[in-house]
Each structure stands twice: as C-alpha cells, then as structure tokens.
Amino acid sequence: MDSNPKTQYGLAKPSISKVPPLPLLTIGQVMMNGAAKYGQMNWRKDPVSSSTYYDAAMRHLMAWWDGQSNDPETGLPHLAHAAANLCILLDAISGPWLMDDRPIAGYTNEFISDNTKKVSTHGDQVPT
C-alpha cells in the first residue's frame, strides 16, 4: 500500500476495482439496447414488478445453459442480458421503484445449508 493519505480513505469505501471491466462493458451494451427499446432507466420512471426481471434473467440463464451463447434478437450474450436484468432489480430495490411480487419466503437457504457437504479448506481439492 502506498503512503498517500487519500489511500486509507479510499480503501474504506466500496471498491469496484475487483470487478472485471469487460463484463461491465458488455452489460452496458445490453443496457444501451434496452434504453433504445424501452427508454433510459425506464424502471425509475414507473415502478416495476420483481417477477418481470426475475423471469427475464432466468430465461436468459436457461438459454445460455441450453448451449445458446447469444440472444438472437440483439446478438449480445445471454449472460449479459441476465446480468442486466439483475442490475435493474438491484437498482430498483434500492429505491422506491420495485413492486416486490415475490412469493412468501420459503426455505431455500435452509435446504441449501442442510444439503451442503462439508469440505476441507484445501483449495486444490474438489468436493466429492
């Protein structure tokens, strides 16, 4: 670490330096496409339902998982589309723009915790 006094203050704030830039730029391309189609930051003008963006993100993830790399309409990566939808949800939930229409909370966290195998902390080992 350098000795500049600004560094200490900077390190106390949220950091973006650990996020790789290329995915952010690709998400930006998707967001530009969406702005042209729906209007820039349209979800901040009219509140949006969480299910709309969850469904869209999941459709893009499923298409990617099914072996389709790019969205046929935009030619941009399905993963970037999914990430853009999640970014919109994160932004909308931070303000008054999200209509939270999720179902009543279930037990997903508990199920995952109960069904997660304990593994050693050796980085070169794969859980069995």
Annotated model-derived regions:
Residues 1-128:
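Intrinsically disordered, low-complexity regulatory regions
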